[in-house]
Every structure is written in C-alpha cells, then in structure tokens.
C-alpha cells in the first residue's frame, strides 16, 4: 500500500523529531535503527525510503534539532537571558531536547563529512545569534565564539559529573563569569 505524500511528510517529520531526541540522549553511535523506528512508530523500510542511510538521517536530524533549538532560543531578548536559559538546571536535565552541541560535540569528530559539515553550520548559526545579542561595544565573532565554547564546555561538564552540587556550581559559575565578562567594555588589546 502506497503512502500519500502528506503521510510520508508526517512520517519524515516524526522520524526527524525522534531521531534528534534519541541522538541527543544516547549519542549518534548509541542509537540503532531499531530504536529509531520504534520511537517513531514506523518500519525500517519507511526510514530507509526517507533517508537512505543512518548517516543521512543523523545529518538531517542534527539540522532539524538545531532549527528547533534556535526557535526556542529566539525569544531571548538579551545575551544574559540566552546564557541564563542555556546554563540552567532545567536545560542541563533536558538532554533529549537540549543543546545539540553539548550532547554531541565529543562524537562529531569521528563522524562523516556530512554530519561534521552540518555541525559546523550549526556552530556558525549559534555564533551569529549570540553576536546579534551582544552589546555593541562587545560585538565580535571571536567574542561570540568564546561565549559558545564556554557555554558548551560548561554544559558538557555539568552533565558529566555525578555530584549535583558541583554540577550546579559549574552552571552558576559560568553564568556569573559570562555576565561579568560581557558587561565590561571590550579592550582594544588581547591580554
């Protein structure tokens, strides 16, 4: 029985949503095709007819997750708001819906070209978003890169440690340090 175009589009969207969630929760290599199809409520055939391979699915799911994250964070009016949301205990606990970069950065270097390219595009998009929220005197791509690297590193560490107090301190210290750093005028020289 053939599936209508509308139903095929719904199936594709469902697979992307579930794959993005599972990849963030378990890693790219920690999720098999069986788990992906079961979570989406579809067959192996529908997955392969839509994407052709797990790598292509991972590439598209990564892009899909980044768009969803970007939409969720787009209502942050200030950089402080963006940092506060990203460095919160709620965000730390939302592995399946949280930061793709913190969830997958350690795995991406071992992936294929397409996945790495998609991840690189995501980094550029987040840097652009962060830069757009920076005060005029601090706006620079390098400053935005430092902010995202700090936040991804902090969230990764906060998720990795088994001590809840230390995890909270990592998030809190990062929020305070970034707030302090970003409230100062940019210096003309690098020290």
Regions found by a protein language model. Name each.
Residues 8, 62, 116-124:
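Amphipathic, non-transmembrane alpha-helical scaffold segments
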Residues 10, 14, 18-56, 60:
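Helix-turn-helix
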Residues 81, 92-120:
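Amphipathic alpha-helical segments used for helix-helix packing
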Residues 112-121, 133-191:
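Hydrophobic/aromatic-rich alpha-helical bundle segments in the mid-to-C-terminal region
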Residues 65, 78-90, 111, 115, ...:
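Alpha-helical bundle regulatory/interaction domains
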Residues 1-10, 184-191:
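N-terminal intrinsically disordered/low-complexity leader segments
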Residues 17, 80-92, 106, 145, ...:
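Amphipathic alpha-helical segments that line or abut small-molecule/effector binding pockets
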Residues 60, 67-98:
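Hydrophobic alpha-helical connector segments
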């Amino acid at each position: 029985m053939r599936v209508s175009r509308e139903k095929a589009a719904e199936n594709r969207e469902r697979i992307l949503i579930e794959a993005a969630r599972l990849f963030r929760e378990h890693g790219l290599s920690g999720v098999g095709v069986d788990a992906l199809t079961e979570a989406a409520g579809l067959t192996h055939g529908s997955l392969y007819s839509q994407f052709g391979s797990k790598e292509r699915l991972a590439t598209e799911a990564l892009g899909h997750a980044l768009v969803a994250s970007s939409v969720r964070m787009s209502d942050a009016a200030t950089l402080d708001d963006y940092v506060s949301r990203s460095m919160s205990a709620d965000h730390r606990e939302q592995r399946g819906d949280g930061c793709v970069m913190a969830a997958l950065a350690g795995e991406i270097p071992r992936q294929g070209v397409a996945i790495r390219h998609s991840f690189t595009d995501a980094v550029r998009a987040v840097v652009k978003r962060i830069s757009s929220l920076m005060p005029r005197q601090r706006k620079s791509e390098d400053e935005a890169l430092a902010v995202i690297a700090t936040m991804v590193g902090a969230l990764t560490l906060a998720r990795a440690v088994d001590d809840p107090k230390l995890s909270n301190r990592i998030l809190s210290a990062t929020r305070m340090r970034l707030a302090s750093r970003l409230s100062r005028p940019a210096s003309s020289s690098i020290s």
